UniProtKB/Swiss-Prot annotation:
Species name: Geotalea uraniireducens (strain Rf4) (Geobacter uraniireducens)
Ranges annotated as spanning the membrane: none
Pfam families hit by this protein: DUF480 (PF04337)
Entry protein name: UPF0502 protein Gura_0277
Domain of life of the organism encoding this protein: Bacteria
PANTHER family recorded: UPF0502 PROTEIN YCEH (PTHR38768:SF1)
Family statement drawn from the similarity comment of this UniProt entry: Belongs to the UPF0502 family.
Length: 219
């Protein structure tokens, strides 16, 4: 994505999408409802505790970036909604996948299908893969596939609203097997060097003996 959101903007945008799909009768959201959604303990990773003023700052930034706006619907209490349908032409399956990625971070296809059921029913994994493919094929792409983690059978996917995701240290750490092989290789190299040094020392001793013998012939 060309625009990079901070962590709070990501959380607010994810909550607006989620609540539109799960509780449309209460959408658009008041500031209080949106703050509660941001601090919700279920379906969130990480779990946050934020004040309304932080949510307001995030909303103002999202409005400036044309990703959210103040709803024009009647009522004395201001309410807010996202603009991804108008701005990016996203459909409910795409919104559901993006909401999950925004609210929980990188996930596998299976995790997205299971967790996204509350927002949109996916008949099978292929349906989720199709949605991910469409989101990755956009210009600019909205989603990326991450390198497969050590010990995992499946790759995870991440949103790009906050730029390219940083790979966790765990993803870059060699597996125990790889680490063990590295140590074994180092040990073999050291043993070989020690053997070569011992051989050189023997040769030096032999050369000294020969030199001494040669000298003794002239004494």
């Amino acid at each position: 994505m060309e625009m990079h959101l901070n962590d709070m903007e990501v959380r607010v945008l994810g909550c607006l999408i989620e609540k539109e799909l799960t509780t449309p009768e209460y959408y658009p959201l008041t500031l209080n409802a949106l703050t509660n959604a941001c601090n919700q303990k279920s379906n969130r990773d990480p779990v946050l505790t934020r004040e309304e003023v932080e949510v307001v700052r995030a909303l103002d930034s999202l409005k400036f970036k044309q990703l959210a706006l103040l709803s024009a619907e009647g009522g004395r209490v201001p309410k807010y909604r996202h603009t991804l349908v108008e701005k990016l032409r996203l459909d409910p399956p795409e919104l559901a996948v993006l909401a999950e990625l925004l609210l929980r971070g990188p996930q596998t296809v299976g995790e997205l299908r299971t967790r996204g059921e509350r927002m949109h029913p996916f008949p099978d994994l292929a349906a989720v893969e199709e949605v991910l493919g469409e989101l990755m094929a956009r210009t600019p792409p909205l989603v990326t596939r991450l390198p497969r983690q050590q010990g995992r059978k499946e790759s995870r996917h991440a949103h790009l609203f906050a730029g390219e995701p940083e790979l966790a240290t765990a993803e870059l750490t060699p597996s125990p097997e790889a680490a063990r092989l590295k140590v074994m290789a180092e040990n073999e190299r050291i043993a070989k060097l020690e053997e070569e040094v011992a051989g050189l020392r023997s040769e030096v001793v032999e050369l000294r003996r020969l030199v001494d013998e040669f000298k003794s012939q002239f004494e």
